[in-house]
Amino acid sequence: MVKRQRIESSNVPLSAFAVRQLTLSKAARKKDNSSGKKRSVSEEESQDKYEDEMKTEGEFPSYKHTLVQVVVPGVDHRTKLHSESSKNDSEITPDINRSKVNPQEYSEFSVASPQTISPSLPLNLDDETVSENVPHSPQSSNDAIPVIKITEENSFRVKDTLYVGLHKDQKLAMVGTFIFRSVRGKFQLFGATYSSACMSWFPLNAPLAFATPVFSAIDNALPAMQISEYEEDSLNLRSFAVPSYSPKEHEYELEPKDILPNFETVIAFRENENGLSKIARVLPFAKRLFSFKNLLQDASSISNNFEITPESWCSFSNQLLFSTSKSDYVVPRLMVCGPKGSGKSSFSRYITNRLLQQYRHIAYLDLDPGQPEVVPSGHISLYYINSPLQGPVFARMLFPTYMLRLHLGDISPQKDPDHYIACVTRLFAEYKDYIFNQEISQKEIIPLIINCPGWIRGGGAELLSSIVDICQPTEVVYMSREDMKSSHREKKSIYQHKEYMPDFLSSRDEFQLTLLESTWQYLPDPNVNKVTSADNRMLGLLSYLYFNCNLQRWDFTTSLTACQPIATAFKGSSKGIDAVNIIGEPLNVNDVAKTINGTLMALYACDTASLDNSNTQRIVSSPEGIPLIINDGLPLDPNTSHCLGLIVLRTIDLKRNEFHFVGPLNLELIKDAYAKSLKIVLERGRLELPVYAMLDHRLAQYSELPYLDRNHDRVAVGAHRRRVRRNIIRRSTFVG
């Protein structure tokens, strides 16, 4: 039998296992050299021999540095090499069948952090060139955001407060969990403008692997209305009750004019230990989010992903604000739509922050159940906010002045579009009632921001058309993933399919259509530090479940199994839960207790008449006495019910006929529901409780934990993360 010869090439993508084998072999050779062994051929002779082979066999120029590309499944490696990494390389690609690689040419290399390496870019194994090809700082990777570094000349620290001075148009990037305010001058942060006239502190949680916030100093003479001109009582500052000046500041008798007097803008920072940095205790992969020593740190040297505001966003928002300043203006109803991953949520957050300069409140209609801004996934909601939206969703403490949310029980409206449209109709009707009351009271009418889901093909286009008919927007913004500027270098991302926009958006004339660009194309590499949608949803859900409403902070040190539960009866005269509803396929009544125990459920407040006088549903009791609504697996009517929050049904006490559940519930809402004689219903949807929420990290033995199977020795088929493919084309499609 003839042995198969292995053909190697400097441009052939190698797997991570091959790279590791080459590195280990090089380390072994160095160890042998240190023990006194002599090499048969010197490095110079090997290099000359290798160059001769390359010239003889392929007539290609020799390569000084050997490039190895780490192959990651699902990532397109056909991208063009970065200009810096291709300066010393030939433009001609050697033939895969004619070129060889000498393993001795590989040198040792070490990766400092997985956050600084892109799996889609070729890595040079030479130590000196790794720092050149891999962007470690924004100055080398992203010239559009020239952030400054904190030095002794532009900063001043007094105990727990850090003061940083900025000149006009200078930018500062910070990461961590901290609070900030303007001591002198004005600055902008992702569309929101802060002024020294407001003495309150604002919280910000800026983890790594997300867009780093950028503080930009602006001209103090700008005659624009700022957020700080409103009364401080109207701002949403309940979650961080911090005095304007600490006793330590009074001790040093600091005056704003005496702090860094050579700078027009001075920003004060303080560390804010709110417990979020300890999220890695319950979610291991979140360790890289806060992988820095201090809770307040300069991001100029540790981040290469900054919050970028394209020029098209700025011009659109300026035009919108200018139109609202006219006497005959119409209060805008802005709908933001586009495909998945196009930056709809980012732009909605940006335009909301800009509009807060002109309005005291903004109505936000969040119709994306997969990536909501305030509530966990699986909900759509309407809320009124009066403070800027800063930071990632899971790291945001936001308490709207009013909120109405409805539970879909799924991250997509695809399985029940009729119920989704009914929920949208209910939420928009609530906004219309509010506007009507404002007009009667002759008060300010607030604008509406509508964030749509990313499902825009097929049935998604029909849903989007229905949303337009219901909400009647005055402005429609379509977010495009296509590069609108040819000056940007070509980039490959996880979104490779052709751009698609529904035809009805351009054919209808009752609104103004605007196409805006996404921000992913401005990043050094869209695939670097990418947090998937599933991980985002898990972060948001765990952040929600571990939030302590009484202390206004996160508590990841206590497991959900160790938290004191809320106990309420489901049977008897003093019952607190009137019924249980299960969305999905019809269920046998005997299996109710097993189906809902240890699951994620929504707490609903329903109108009494909707349950008593309904012809399509009835309430029966299970063998355990649990009241179950029989309505063919349909959700509750959104016109007569609303969601109070998410809970984890931890235990069903059959002896006392009680439900024990945990979750950040607002007990005042439950008390108000009882006062209005509303019935409390638990609804089980299709949302899955993460495995990390079931674990009790205090225990060492996982085999005895219920509902959890952790077998480290053998992994069964199907035990990995579930992945659904929706891009499979059947053969029947090609049959004429």
Curated annotation (Swiss-Prot):
This is Polynucleotide 5'-hydroxyl-kinase grc3. It comes from Schizosaccharomyces pombe (strain 972 / ATCC 24843) (Fission yeast). PANTHER family: CLEAVAGE/POLYADENYLATION FACTOR IA SUBUNIT CLP1P, POLYNUCLEOTIDE 5'-HYDROXYL-KINASE NOL9. Pfam families: CLP1_P (PF16575). The gene is grc3. Belongs to the Clp1 family. NOL9/GRC3 subfamily. Residues 47-58, 81-90 have a biased composition (Basic and acidic residues). Polynucleotide 5'-kinase required for both rRNA processing and heterochromatic gene silencing. GO terms for biological process: cleavage in ITS2 between 5.8S rRNA and LSU-rRNA of tricistronic rRNA transcript (SSU-rRNA, 5.8S rRNA, LSU-rRNA); rRNA processing. ATP binds at G338, P339, K340, G341, S342, G343, K344, S345. One of its GO terms (molecular function) is ATP binding.
